[in-house]
Structure formats: C-alpha cells, structure tokens
C-alpha cells in the first residue's frame, strides 16, 4: 500500500544537494518518475516519461526522476535526460520503500503538505493518465497525451532489486546492485543487510 513519506525524509539530487522532503515541496508539488537503472522496464519508459515530465516544466510544480541508484548510475542510465529535469538519487531505496513502491517504473505525486496524492507502479497508461491529469487539474495546466504514439504497450513493472515484501512491511536484503541481487537472489549477496 502506498503512503505519504515522512516530511523529514531526505531527497538527494544527482548533484549531491540533500534536503528534507518538506524543503523540496515548500512552494511546489512534486511529480517524480521512479526508475531502477538495473531493469529493462525502466529503460522502456524513459522517452515516454520525459515527454510527460516536459509537459509540466512551465507549471508551478517540480518534475523529475527518482533513480534507485547513485549519481553515476543515474547519469549513465538517463544520459541527457538527467539534465532536463531534477534528478534525485535513492541508492538504498529508502525513499521508495517509504512510499511503498515495490516495482519500477513508477510515478508519484506529492503535494506541499507533503502528502502523497497519487502513485502507481509499472506502465499502465490509464493509471499514469489519472495521476498526471490530477496534477494538470490542480495546476490548471494542459494534460499530456497518454498513451501517445511511440509509447510502449502496458507492462507490469520489475521488482525493485533488493526489496522484499514481508507481511506488508518491506526489508532490503543485499546491496541491490551486484549481479547476484539483480538476478533476484539478494540473500546470496555478500553485503547482506536489513533495514
């Protein structure tokens, strides 16, 4: 189940600026596309997500990426897209875990409270359309076409490497980045840890 993140939870930009969530949403809503640089599913949505985010660049909201990885992984995975919008990094998946996502890609909308307004995971154009239409209505802004020509067909997201569901609670096992973790066997990772 999705839930609002703690206002004190830190979000770190790709440039290393780390601030509590409340500081990032003082004046603006936040629309983030969550991606895992170790999944094919994340790469399939980059152009579509970039088009959707571009629609809101002039609106009174912040739009960007939330990459489950470090700055180098985010820059490599997103390429020039990492410079188009604000890019946050979440190397251990702490923020993503707090929101309740277990798959990527995903999209989340957080208001100025900061409260989670909407979230979904995987690429379901109808669900993404509801989220971005809600933001467009709130911003009194135009809506991007979803789906649009060239968008991928709907698909379920990939499990976030290292996130494991446990009676509704989530634990992170393994580093989530090594080949063992990416192969879905985080329990065999040499850097096993639980948060």
Across the structure, where does each feature detected by a protein language model lie?
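Glycine-rich phosphate/adenylate-binding loop and adjacent beta-alpha elements
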Residues: 169-195
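Short, internal strand/loop/helix patches
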Residues: 79-108
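A generic "binding-loop/recognition-motif" signal
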Residues: 70, 91-92, 113, 174, ...
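Aromatic-flanked redox-active Cys/Sec active sites in thiol-based oxidoreductases
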Residues: 33-39, 68
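Non-globular targeting/processing and membrane-anchoring segments
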Residues: 1-30, 40, 44, 51-62, ...
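Conserved beta-strand and immediately adjacent loop positions that scaffold enzyme active sites
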Residues: 8, 106, 177
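Thiol-based oxidoreductase modules, predominantly thioredoxin-like and allied folds used
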Residues: 58-74, 83-92
